[in-house]
Swiss-Prot record:
5-methyltetrahydropteroyltri-L-glutamate binds at R15, E16, L17, K18, K118, R532, C533, W578, E622. Pathway: Amino-acid biosynthesis; L-methionine biosynthesis via de novo pathway; L-methionine from L-homocysteine (MetE route): step 1/1. Zn(2+) binds at H658, C660, E682, C743. The gene is metE. It is an enzyme of class 2 (transferase). The lineage of its organism: Bacteria, Pseudomonadati, Bacteroidota, Cytophagia, Cytophagales. This is 5-methyltetrahydropteroyltriglutamate--homocysteine methyltransferase. GO terms for biological process: methionine biosynthetic process; methylation.
Amino acid sequence: MIAHNLGYPRIGDNRELKKACEQYWSGAITQQKLQDVAKAIRTNNWLTQKDAGLDLIPCNDFSFYDQVLDMSFMLGLIPERFSSLLQKKDLTELDIYFAMARGYQKDGYDITAMEMTKWFDTNYHYIVPEFRKDQKFSPISEKAIREYTEAKVVIGKAAKPVLLGPVSYLLAGKEKEAGFNRIELIENLLPVYTKLLATLQQNGAEWIQLDEPFLVMDLTVQERKTYETTYTALRNLFPSLKFIVATYFECTGTNIDIAAKLPVDALHLDLVRCPSQLSDILTPAFISSNTMLSLGVVDGRNVWKNDFSTSSTFITKAIAALGKERVMIAPSCSLLHVPCDLDNEKNGNVLTPEIKNWMAFAKQKLHEVAALKKLNRAPMQSEELRLLKANTESIENRAKSKLIHKQHVKARVKAVQPSDSQRKSLFKSRQQIQEKALQLPLMPTTTIGSFPQTDEVRANRAKYKKGDITLAQYEDFVKTEMTKAIEWQEKIGIDVLVHGEFERNDMVEYFGEQLKGYVFSENGWVQSYGSRCVKPPIIYGDIERTEPMTVAWTTLAQSLTKKYMKGMLTGPVTILQWSFVRDDQPRRDTCMQIAFAIRDEVVDLEAAGIKIIQIDEPAIREGLPLRRENWETYLNWAVECFRISASGVKDETQIHTHMCYSEFNDIIKNIAAMDADVITIETSRSQMELLDAFVDFNYPNEIGPGVYDIHSPRIPTTDEMADLLNKAMHVLPVRNIWVNPDCGLKTRRWPETEAALINMVAAAQKIRKEITTVV
């Protein structure tokens, strides 16, 4: 048996990479210092995995920003708009790499960033490769080779280079012009992959992990064929190189026949998301082959301890069919998606000892993988018996704990009625009522909710949490920041204001801190994109709201302006998606509990005089099962949960929702079924591509297509945003259009925020002047 890992968090135990990248971008440190920080993280990661007892350890899983962008750079896939930067002698390879991710706006250049989207159904984002017809590939970076050479010095032959497989790389991208299918580029791409693999082999690599997560997706006949021909070609070119093809996040399903027949040395299956596929793969044909089977039995996407007894049943079954020599044990996917080390959680008042004992972070999961290998070697020694006993006690303690269950919460969910998810009137009637009540201008301007969380804001929050300042002092500071933000919004002419969310650390954690059934970590950070890290709250039990969460701050903000102040809430599906969720009941039940908690908050905001309430659901699409056949069930309960949260108010109260990073052309009917009065969406990076859905679907409610990309520091011009609004007007009735950024502005700095929003208001005013009739 071989114990191995698919990938490890690259942010560092204390977010060293985030801090170093941001310091480099601001000019505070040199590139050499940034590289030194990166090397220290890589070395620590490799030694941590070696010390845990793993036989094969991934390398090239580190990234300064994103592993898909790394692959693009290694393959020489640099969009034409960045080509001029290659001639700038003062820009290094890393500078151009960052420019592709973040845009470049200096020295007379004004280059937009590449598109970013969610990595399958996770909370991680990747930079989308851009393909053109007859795309040529030419290696620019030798990152994988450098990092393998570096790893070999630290961990020797255990080093296993990890690459995004060629077919998944193509499928992860987008065609940037018509007239071709990106999968056809495999003939141009394969020679560059071949060169990379050859160099790795020449440098001593024995195992290569090729991640092919698209093997769990619905594939066309052409895509299925491409998998077969690609891996046959690689096998013929590299008969002695050991390939492990890794699938994860879902069942291989109808693709299992392809996966099982690939001429590779090992196939990895995610048995956490899809335990049934172990039986599916153990057919006579697979058993009679020489392919090893990697069992993804340790959950790479959640924080709960592995149940050794359950995992051992899978391992025992595989050993019985294949023999120990053909079995590998691993996490279900890369550990990128979980925090680094549970040992960094030292405050028992934050993460209570009882609940902490139910959990495992990345480092602990490595030890679980190694322990499972030991436990399945017969006969068990005293060490193995001790490991099994401790694990069994922890699993049983969690199952029996009185902390988890609240019968009155369960009863409310069980008693849900259709009327709980229905507004009093249809949208057409509500729109007329709201227009009369609110008296907003045509194409009203607003922002999504948050304003920049400056160093001063973060420092004051940290001081309060450490006890260095009192609650009163902290609240005075927040009120001062909020007042400045409100006055500034009024000054530049924004129509519907927000309070800026200066009191909130994170749009999910803030609510989790005030809901029963949640627990938190101090250092449970995971990477969202680039240098952005999030610290997901942890749902361990039934969810209950025992008192108002946002009413005090929102009503205070409303008292500071005569304009409308939006109440700002996070929706139930997003709270679910962006948390580590209990795994002892269906996700639908947990989401329904959250929905009723948010509903109670919405009703209280309305009673306090708030006329416009936004319930953010940026994660609604990422919750979609990866297979279309499973979509309907999820969408039914997700939409129902949103409607429950929003349907307790009068017709006069305008409900907004927001979705960012969302490509939901294919679920537009379900988005309409949410029945929000106004939806704001991410569209600018894709140049309003999202609005294509409205050509075929007459979206009934109001909509704010984002007119500028907040994920880049680049400042859009007034004309650019006016052009995007003109595109929207060709698809949507003018009376239904709102003007807003793509997403919240928390991660931006004030100078770029101010400049961009001033231009945005000017764009709206320009379009209003040009409109002579209301469509």
